[in-house]
């Protein structure tokens, strides 16, 4: 590996594409006749295929979880702090697979892909997806790679929901579930945040009912506002106060409604601008709906313990003290249900000032707890 990369990096990685021509039936009643999933792998699959770990991404995530696509990249993959030699998901031990989910906008088939039936981008005609749909598609990817059972399925936030769903839908295919900063279903407040974000996009004049690509435009304003709202919920009050306080961009107030006066305003606008230039509006709508619809215990009348009665995986559940988007109380709901179902579970509640985004930040106790659990997994 080139010396330009840190010694604990997986180094240069090349995305790969898997095409599936067998129709995929979806929860909404529709199906996809064919689709593609973009993914990356890190480490080496052992002879018995017993060391495979699946990484499931959150709302705005993608397949590029670790390493670099070029020596000139300024930043590595989004979870590089946790994936690599000697890191919690140690690529000296594990073969790691990270994908861009169906409906995404980073290469996998999604709303911005060409609909073979029309020759135009799917746009708003792309079917609504659920977490369970994603898991079904991920099963096929695993089989394509020769993996019948995952040593672990790992994810944070929406990724944690996928990890939990894996153990319910395919209990025989998962030995360990690492579910971080997640919840067994969304609260009314979380659904409300998602609806505000969707309305920002849907009411943008440039959205054109989801057919904005046909018009050669992007609903930039709506995406920007959606990201600004979402980003506030990913941070804690303390971390925002420490980072920005009431600091001004200049040394005076302008007494108008158009200037960017506070540092926190500047930060949110930057985050919104950056996001609106790289993310697809229809994908954002799909991802938030998948979050809203996630409720694996619904079929059991809301009884999560009964839903988990048949699972066989061991679980590691982690939460962060200042995460108010998916608070520790939501993780403890999962832990309590697993204990009621007499399943093996360990729980780590980590003191962190970083809010929901803490699952992306390599604080010492988080890294130690994560490593300790992963190192216990027999391969």
From Swiss-Prot:
Annotated Gene3D superfamilies: 1.10.1740.110, alpha/beta hydrolase
Annotated site residue numbers, Important for acyl-CoA specificity: 325
Pathway the protein takes part in: Amino-acid biosynthesis; L-methionine biosynthesis via de novo pathway; O-succinyl-L-homoserine from L-homoserine: step 1/1
Binding site residues for substrate: 227, 357
Reaction it catalyzes: L-homoserine + succinyl-CoA = O-succinyl-L-homoserine + CoA
Keywords for the protein's UniProt record, in alphabetical order: Acyltransferase, Amino-acid biosynthesis, Cytoplasm, Methionine biosynthesis, Transferase
One Pfam family per UniProt: Abhydrolase_1
InterPro entries: AB_hydrolase_1, AB_hydrolase_fold, HAT_MetX-like
Record EC number: 2.3.1.46
Broad class of the protein's primary localization: cytoplasm
One of the GO biological process terms: homoserine metabolic process
Catalytic-site annotation from UniProt: 157 (nucleophile), 323, 356
Function: Transfers a succinyl group from succinyl-CoA to L-homoserine, forming succinyl-L-homoserine.
Quaternary structure note: Homodimer.
Family, similarity comment: Belongs to the AB hydrolase superfamily. MetX family.
HAMAP family attached to this UniProt entry: MetX_acyltransf (MF_00296)
Record protein name field: Homoserine O-succinyltransferase
Gene coding for it: metXS
């Amino acid at each position: 590996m080139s010396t330009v990369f840190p010694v604990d990096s997986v180094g240069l990685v090349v995305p790969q594409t898997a095409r599936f021509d067998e129709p995929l039936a979806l929860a909404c009643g529709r199906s996809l006749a064919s689709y593609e999933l973009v993914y990356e792998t890190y480490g080496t699959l052992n002879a018995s295929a017993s060391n495979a770990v699946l990484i499931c991404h959150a709302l705005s995530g993608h397949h590029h979880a670790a390493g670099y696509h070029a020596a000139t990249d300024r930043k590595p993959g989004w979870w590089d702090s946790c994936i690599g030699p000697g890191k919690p998901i140690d690529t000296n031990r594990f073969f790691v697979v990270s994908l861009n989910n169906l409906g995404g906008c980073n290469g996998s088939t999604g709303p911005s892909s060409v609909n073979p039936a029309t020759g135009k981008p799917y746009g708003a005609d792309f079917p609504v997806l659920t977490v369970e749909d994603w898991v079904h598609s991920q099963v096929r990817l695993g089989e394509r790679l020769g993996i019948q059972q995952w040593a672990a399925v790992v994810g944070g936030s929406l990724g944690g929901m996928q990890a939990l769903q894996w153990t319910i839908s395919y209990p025989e295919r998962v030995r360990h579930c690492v579910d971080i900063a997640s919840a067994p279903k969304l609260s009314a407040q979380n659904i409300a945040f998602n609806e505000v974000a969707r309305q920002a996009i849907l009411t943008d004049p440039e959205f054109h009912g989801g057919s904005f690509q046909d018009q050669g435009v992007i609903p930039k304003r709506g995406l920007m506002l959606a990201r600004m709202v979402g980003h506030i919920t990913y941070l804690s009050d303390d971390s925002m106060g420490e980072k920005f306080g009431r600091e001004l961009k200049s040394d005076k107030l302008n007494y108008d409604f158009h200037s960017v006066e506070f540092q926190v305003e500047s930060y949110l606008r930057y985050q919104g601008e950056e996001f609106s230039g790289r993310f697809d509006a229809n994908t954002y709508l799909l991802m938030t709906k998948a979050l809203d619809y996630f409720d694996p215990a619904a079929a059991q009348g809301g009884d999560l313990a009964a839903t988990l009665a048949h699972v066989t995986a061991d679980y590691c559940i982690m939460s962060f003290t200042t995460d108010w988007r998916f608070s520790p109380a939501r993780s403890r709901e999962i832990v309590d249900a697993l204990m009621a179902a007499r399943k093996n579970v360990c729980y780590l509640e980590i003191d962190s000032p970083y809010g929901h985004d803490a699952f992306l930040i390599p604080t010492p106790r988080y890294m130690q707890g994560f490593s300790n659990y992963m190192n216990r997994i027999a391969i």
